[in-house]
Amino acid sequence: MFSFFKKKKTVAHIKLSGVIGNAGKFKQGIDFAGQEEIIKKAFSLKKASCVAITINSPGGSPVQSHLIYNFIRQEAKNSKKRVIVFAEDVAASGGYLISCAGDEIYANSSSIIGSIGVIYSSFGFTELIKKIGVERRVHTAG
């Protein structure tokens, strides 16, 4: 029988976007201090059957990433709620670590999903490159 009074399923949603590190009033980004209350509130919603997290981050601080990851897992365990993560454009390095806090992870086939703790270092020869006419080409796969 149809009823207007049936309880609708609710999903709590957290959006994490930006570089992971010391964020502040005038500095955008993701850090544990700025997300702690938001995460707590999402998991404490009694009507919510699960928590969805949308992440769009190239990574950043490994410490902040790990603090957020651990806190999400702790809150999920305490509340007995599943965590579903949706990677938007990028979930790399620390963003990927936070994504791993999910019980399920979904990503677009065009999303950049990266590994944890990758650092690339190189030398720059910009003047020499200009002088001898070297052209830059980028190839990606995956």
What positions do the PLM features span?
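Small-residue-centered hinge/linker elements
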Residues: M1-K81, V90-L97, A101-G142
